[in-house]
Swiss-Prot record:
Keywords: Cytoplasm, Initiation factor, Protein biosynthesis, RNA-binding, rRNA-binding. One of the essential components for the initiation of protein synthesis. Stabilizes the binding of IF-2 and IF-3 on the 30S subunit to which N-formylmethionyl-tRNA(fMet) subsequently binds. Helps modulate mRNA selection, yielding the 30S pre-initiation complex (PIC). Upon addition of the 50S ribosomal subunit IF-1, IF-2 and IF-3 are released leaving the mature 70S translation initiation complex. Belongs to the IF-1 family. It is found in: Cytoplasm. Disulfide bonds: none annotated. NCBIfam families: infA. Residues 1-72 form the S1-like domain. InterPro entries: NA-bd_OB-fold (IPR012340), RNA-binding_domain_S1_IF1 (IPR006196), TIF_IF1 (IPR004368). The keyword Ligase does not apply. This is Translation initiation factor IF-1. It comes from Rhodopseudomonas palustris (strain BisB18).
Length: 93
């Protein structure tokens, strides 16, 4: 049996749920529950409410998805958010 084709959508994280799950508003208007993909957990990529993400879904269940990519911010330079302490401020021993 062949592996089914997965569908990719883009959306916006609206709410963080327990157990590394997120409520995501898709660009098409639907709202789904998505979980973090294993590679994102392994690389400790954090996702916050308001982040743009790419979701992978099975054509058989369009209510759940896997969060596979967090898009970088549109801030110029893609640097840290305002108010964050500059890197290298604290000395490591």
């Amino acid at each position: 049996m062949a592996k089914e084709e997965l569908i990719q959508f883009e959306g916006l994280v609206t709410e963080i749920l327990p157990d590394a799950r997120y409520r995501v508003q898709l660009d098409a208007g639907h709202e789904i529950v998505a979980y973090t993909a294993g590679k994102m957990k392994k690389n400790r990529i954090k996702t916050l409410a308001g982040d743009r993400v790419t979701i992978e879904m099975s054509p058989y269940d369009l209510e759940k998805g896997r969060l596979i990519f967090r898009h970088k911010d549109e801030r110029p330079g893609g640097g840290p958010p305002r108010g964050a302490p500059p890197r290298g401020q604290f000395r490591r021993r």
